[in-house]
UniProtKB/Swiss-Prot annotation:
Enzyme class: ligase
Catalytic activity: UDP-N-acetyl-alpha-D-muramoyl-L-alanine + D-glutamate + ATP = UDP-N-acetyl-alpha-D-muramoyl-L-alanyl-D-glutamate + ADP + phosphate + H(+)
InterPro entries assigned to the protein according to its UniProt record, in alphabetical order: Folylpolyglutamate_synth_CS, Mur-like_cat_sf, Mur_ligase_C, Mur_ligase_C_dom_sf, Mur_ligase_cen, MurD
Keywords tagged on the record: ATP-binding, Cell cycle, Cell division, Cell shape, Cell wall biogenesis/degradation, Cytoplasm, Ligase, Nucleotide-binding, Peptidoglycan synthesis
Protein residues bound to ATP: 129-135
Pfam families, per database record: Mur_ligase_C (PF02875), Mur_ligase_M (PF08245), MurD-like_N (PF21799)
GO cellular component: cytoplasm
Localization per Swiss-Prot or TrEMBL: Cytoplasm
EC number assigned by the record: 6.3.2.9
Pathway where it operates: Cell wall biogenesis; peptidoglycan biosynthesis
Lineage: Bacteria, Pseudomonadati, Pseudomonadota, Betaproteobacteria, Burkholderiales
Name the record gives this protein: UDP-N-acetylmuramoylalanine--D-glutamate ligase
Function comment: Cell wall formation. Catalyzes the addition of glutamate to the nucleotide precursor UDP-N-acetylmuramoyl-L-alanine (UMA).
Organism, scientific name: Cupriavidus metallidurans (strain ATCC 43123 / DSM 2839 / NBRC 102507 / CH34) (Ralstonia metallidurans)
Length: 504
């Protein structure tokens, strides 16, 4: 279960969901476990003490003596390697030649062990990206089920990968396919995971406080494809330069985007008669045999020339229940991953039509006086809000603001100028948003609460418009979390409906 290590004494750093899962897993597999957390009494301590009575817990600042008699460090994804206390401990571990793994590395080692000892060889699909990970992961899992395979969906989406694997082993229900949603934090300490196919949906500014730079953030995302010699099929967004830079020569590459695909096996959008269609590029066997190959463009860097293609219509984009072209790209990525493991296309297309989306991700809430209200509370960074504005393709009254995490808000300027009727600002970084969006010429209105923001948005919106909560910011300045923020928004929309004599 632990590679060349034989039931090592494990130091688990951090006792969040992943930390508890790693402690459980290591204890279950015969390891001595020491758990350290900078908090003296983390919430999960009661579960650790109840489930793993032999585990040693040490609270407070990390010190080098935590490493005494340790053979493996298992680090939680919430701990940045740049934080001074954590960095000092990791450097000390390196000096002692103690390996440092994350939860997904433990999962990968376990899958390798199961294959070697019992022949269990599941297909593994992996998904990351700044935005759209959870929707794409959940959708991929649904499509696999629709195609008649058993599937384990885990990782950043919850449950943790190790908890899910433990449950499957205990119940003798190991799945045919694993679908893993992976954050950049999880990938930082993942080394041997070798998915059959993986995607990076997009890379925009986020988590720079954890990684230190965009280059480091993108490099962590690129780890999802595993060791180059394993030949992971890459599914990349051809309209995102940072993801296309991850393409490897000699590796099968499938791309997706909202433009027309130019290489066989890639996905895109064909607009015909005002209707957008999801399409698949196929070799055009009827093309003129004398036609000279064209130089390959940005959607496939693995070869020098392209063959002629025709575009097979798969389904109208409007047939998707999930709204917006950004969700159409998520759907294409999920479809590409499933086709990479040879699942039948017709079953997958039926699954796409049935999927209704995940909560708080451009989720329809109500229509009041011909104005639609959408909850995108999970839009906690600029890239998510840009995608939501562009994807809805309507006049929008945007509710934005919160804890900005030091982001650059300037990428919002163009979509706000194009789509917004007005922006209602809330939260700690409302001033920074106002400064960034001043050049748009759009009305910028302050609100002291989310309830007030809904009232003001309703007065600004016109028939056919959308009121969109897509904050581009974290929620912790005003709310417990993004779910609480969504609940307050939905409650305010319901009150608005009742005040106008409409049953929500």
């Amino acid at each position: 279960m632990f590679g060349v290590l034989q039931k090592p004494h494990v130091l688990v750093l951090g006792l969040g969901e992943s930390g508890l899962a790693m402690a459980r897993w290591c204890g279950l597999n015969g390891c001595r476990v020491r758990v350290a957390d900078t908090r003296e009494a983390p919430a999960n301590l009661v579960f650790l003490q109840a489930e793993l009575t032999t585990a040693q817990f040490m609270g407070g600042q990390f010190t080098e003596n935590l490493l005494d008699d340790i053979g493996l460090v298992a680090i939680s994804p919430g701990l940045s390697p740049l934080e001074p206390n954590t960095r000092a401990l990791l450097e000390a571990a390196q000096a002692r030649s103690i390996p440092v793994w994350g939860e997904i590395e433990l999962f990968a080692q376990a899958i390798g062990y199961l294959e070697a000892t019992s022949g269990y060889a599941p297909r593994v699909l992996a998904i990351t990206g700044t935005n759209g990970k959870t929707t794409t992961t959940a959708l991929t899992g649904r499509l696999i089920e629709r195609a008649g395979k058993t599937v384990g969906v885990a990782g950043n989406i919850s449950p943790s990968a190790l908890d899910k694997l433990s449950a499957c082993i205990a119940s003798a229900t190991l799945p045919d396919v694993w679908v893993l949603e992976l954050s950049s934090f999880q990938l930082e300490y993942t080394f041997s995971l070798a998915p059959h196919a993986a995607t990076v949906l997009n890379v925009t500014q986020d988590h720079l406080d954890w990684h230190g730079s965009m280059e480091a953030y993108a490099a962590a995302k690129a780890r999802i494809f595993g060791p180059a010699e394993k030949g992971c099929l890459q599914v990349l967004n051809r309209q995102d330069p940072l993801t296309m830079n991850m393409a490897r020569r000699g590796t099968t590459l499938v791309t997706f985007g909202t433009d027309l695909p130019e290489t066989p096996g890639s996905y895109g959008v064909l607009r015909e008669g005002g209707m957008p269609w999801l399409v698949l590029a196929e070799p055009d066997t009827e093309a003129d045999a004398e036609q000279k190959p064209r130089r390959r463009k940005k959607d496939d860097v693995a070869a020098d020339a392209v063959v002629p293609v025709r575009h097979k219509r798969l389904m109208p984009a409007d047939a998707l229940h999930i709204r917006g072209m950004h969700n159409a790209t998520n759907a294409m990525a999920a479809l590409a991953l499933c086709r990479a493991i040879d699942l039948p296309l017709n079953a997958l297309l039926h699954g796409l039509r049935e999927y209704r989306g995940e909560p708080h991700r451009v989720e329809w809430v109500a229509t009041i006086d011909e104005v639609e209200y959408f909850d995108d509370s999970k839009g906690t960074n600029v890239g998510a809000t840009v995608a939501a504005l562009s994807g809805l393709d309507k006049h929008v009254v945007l509710i934005a603001g919160g804890e900005g995490k030091g982001q650059d808000f300037s990428p919002l300027v163009a979509p706000v100028a194009q789509y917004a009727r007005a922006v209602v600002l809330i939260g700690k970084d409302a001033g920074a948003l106002r400064e960034a969006l001043g050049a748009t010429g759009k009305p910028l209105i302050d609100a002291g609460s989310l309830e007030e923001a809904v009232e003001k948005s309703a007065s600004l919106a016109e028939a056919g418009d959308v009121v969109l909560l897509s904050p581009a910011c974290a929620s912790l300045d005003m709310f417990r979390n993004y779910v609480h923020r969504a609940q307050v928004f939905r409650g305010a929309v319901e009150e608005l409906a009742l005040s106008r004599g409409i049953m929500p």
